[in-house]
From Swiss-Prot:
GO biological process terms, semicolon-separated: argininosuccinate metabolic process; L-arginine biosynthetic process; urea cycle
Name of the protein in its database record: Argininosuccinate synthase
Positions with a binding annotation for ATP: 10-18, 38, 119
Pathway participation: Amino-acid biosynthesis; L-arginine biosynthesis; L-arginine from L-ornithine and carbamoyl phosphate: step 2/3
Catalytic activity reported: L-citrulline + L-aspartate + ATP = 2-(N(omega)-L-arginino)succinate + AMP + diphosphate + H(+)
Pfam families xref list: Arginosuc_syn_C (PF20979), Arginosuc_synth (PF00764)
EC number, UniProt record: 6.3.4.5
Residues the record lists as binding L-citrulline: 89, 125, 129, 177, 186, 262, 274
Family: Belongs to the argininosuccinate synthase family. Type 1 subfamily.
Length: 401
């Protein structure tokens, strides 16, 4: 008897998930393998991917359009949380995993599967994200992980697939592993495993090289309501279209490339190349608007919790109780984050040149001005400073004799 009878496999069309299909059937005795491929705005035609799964031996091959929930339920909360893992990576890939896991569980319930499966290897973050998300949503459902257990190198995996007539998409000329969705692209493997090797221009697709960007700067305005971006240059856009527009604007000016050494969940460091033009642009603008509309103590506390929020998402704990509790805090802070931020895009940089909030700005010109309109009570400062510095004064009197 096999490890499971009917399995729903998260399918991307790549080497590992394609090889999983015959492997589950031939090696583990699975009778039916149903694949599910998610459309996350990656731009691929899903029909060839669907057919590829059937050619590899899938009993049924399903595809699903998840672009709208991906942006509204996952990307926008990340923008509100200014989510940057280790201060840099805006979680473009990590945000997709809990959504895919959620839909995987739903499909498994719909078709009566007794297990789900994925093609993640034992060294990556995605295995953690899928396993933990599925356990959070359906603790009774078995999770099969052939790529983690088969012990094959990438070359051996490709060779196994060739036994079943699968052509290899990886060549000596293009040895990279690429994951993409509407929010961005992650590129790794091949020569990039040497952290001293500069990424070649061929690995980028969403952003221009700085020397190929316009010589003239472009100023844009991004409008936010309740912490969510709603308009660019005065034109209101639904969420998916807004992300596409932000990608185009930022990418045209070479904004959004990251080359970083990253600490993976499993304890190793990895070299990652990311392209996330629109997401980074929107987070930068959102942070600037918060500096105008949030009280100082709220802003400081939020900046601390943003790091934890990003860590939780990166570590696969999207559906965990702490992440959900932090969501409540983040959402409450965004009520008054309404306004417009102006940025200048030029040669790989986005520079804030203005910010305004008609109803929620905490910047009061009359209090900040040094001119004749100054309404700040300077005389109050003396008493404030005395009380503020009293603990230090008392300590000094005791210890600096």
């Amino acid at each position: 008897m096999g490890r499971a009878t009917k399995v729903v496999l998260a399918y991307s069309g790549g080497v590992d998930t394609s090889v999983c299909i015959p492997y589950l059937k031939q090696e583990w005795g699975v009778e039916e393998v149903i694949t599910f491929a998610a459309d996350l705005g990656q731009g691929d035609e899903l029909e060839p991917i669907r057919l590829k799964a059937l050619e590899a031996g899938a009993t049924q091959s399903l595809v699903g359009d998840l672009i709208k929930p991906f942006i509204e339920e996952f990307a926008f909360p990340a923008i509100r949380a200014n989510a940057l893992y280790e201060g840099r990576y805006p979680l473009s890939t990590a945000l997709a995993r809990p959504l895919i896991a959620r839909r995987l569980v739903e499909v498994a319930r719909e078709v009566g599967a007794d297990a789900v499966a994925h093609g993640c290897t034992g060294k990556g973050n995605d295995q953690v994200r899928f396993d933990v998300a599925i356990a959070s949503l359906a603790p009774d459902l078995k999770v099969l992980t052939p790529a983690r257990e088969w012990g094959m190198s990438r070359e051996e995996t490709i060779a196994y697939g060739e036994r079943f007539g699968m052509p290899s998409p990886v060549s000596k000329k293009s040895p990279y592993s690429i994951d993409l969705n509407l929010l961005g692209r992650s590129i790794e493997a091949g020569p990039l495993e040497d952290p001293m090797v500069a990424p070649p221009e061929e690995v980028f697709a969403m952003t221009r090289s700085v020397d190929q960007t316009p010589n003239d700067a472009e100023e844009i305005e991004i409008q936010f309501e309740g912490g969510n971006p709603v308009a660019i240059n005065g034109k209101r856009l639904e969420p998916v279209s807004l992300i596409r527009e932000a990608n185009l604007l930022a990418g045209t000016h070479g904004i959004g490339r990251l080359d970083m050494i990253e600490n993976r969940v499993v304890g190793i460091k990895s070299r990652e190349i990311y392209e996330t033009p629109g997401l980074l642009l929107l987070i930068q603008a959102h942070q600037e608007l918060e500096s105008l509309t949030l009280a100082a103590d709220v802003l400081r506390t939020k900046r601390q919790l943003e790091m934890q929020w990003a860590d939780l998402v990166y570590q696969g704990l999207w559906f965990g109780p702490l992440k959900e509790a932090l969501d409540g805090f983040m959402d409450r802070t965004q009520i008054h984050v309404n306004g417009v931020v102006r940025l200048k895009l030029h040669k790989g940089n986005a520079t804030v040149t203005g910010r305004a909030s008609t109803d929620n700005s905490l910047y009061i010109p009359e209090m900040a001005s040094y001119g004749s309109e100054d309404k700040f009570d300077h005389r109050a400062a003396e008493g404030f400073i005395y009380v503020w510095g009293l603990p230090t004064r008392l300590w000094a009197a005791k210890h600096r004799r």
